[in-house]
Design a protein with these regions (language model features):
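Signature of Asx- and small-polar-rich beta-strand/turn repeats characteristic
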Residues: 1-170
Length: 170
């Protein structure tokens, strides 16, 4: 099964920082909503987001953001705690929002909810070259057009540990 795909656009723009009191060395476009349609199309207006932070240098007072991919919609987050009683499968990590674009998923795993550092997990659609230390996740569609994240079992992919905290944005 294939997920829905968000409409995308590629934009470029610059920010003139010459009037700023403090002269920045870099400028960061934060992940999230960056543009909304000014006029409505039919009966709807549209919002566009960037999927991750983008930092560019400021050169001669100008920060140029070139070829920035923006996606239609709003980014959402889901969080899961790996069960202390049952850290191994069949623990289920189901994203509750239907009709998501799975290509925009970003998965981070922290040792515990209080941990400040995390490891990025990447999507895999194959077991080839996946070993016991690979930080990967798999996806399967479940009921009502929702998706479930599946993590390694310690043979194919790194196994999650009790009380690990999973951060998912999409």
């Amino acid at each position: 099964p294939r997920s829905r795909t968000a409409s995308k656009a590629i934009i470029s723009f610059f920010v003139d920082t010459t009037g700023f009191t403090t002269k920045p060395v870099t400028l960061t476009l934060k992940k999230g909503i960056v543009a909304t349609s000014a006029a409505t199309f039919g009966s709807e207006s549209y919002s566009f987001c960037v999927p991750s932070d983008i930092t560019v240098p400021v050169v001669d007072g100008i920060a140029t953001f070139g070829d920035v991919t923006i996606c239609e919609g709003a980014f959402l987050t889901s969080n899961f705690v790996v069960s202390a009683e049952n850290p191994a499968p069949p623990s289920r990590y189901i994203l509750q929002n239907p009709n998501i674009d799975t290509s925009t998923l970003e998965v981070q795993v922290r040792e515990t909810q209080a941990s400040t550092s995390s490891k990025k997990y990447v999507f895999s659609d194959t077991l080839i070259e996946v070993d016991s230390s690979s930080c990967v996740y798999f996806i399967q569609e479940v009921e009502d057009q929702r998706y479930e994240l599946i993590f390694g079992d310690g043979v194919f992919g790194k196994k999650l540990e009790s009380l690990n905290y999973i951060d998912v944005s999409y």
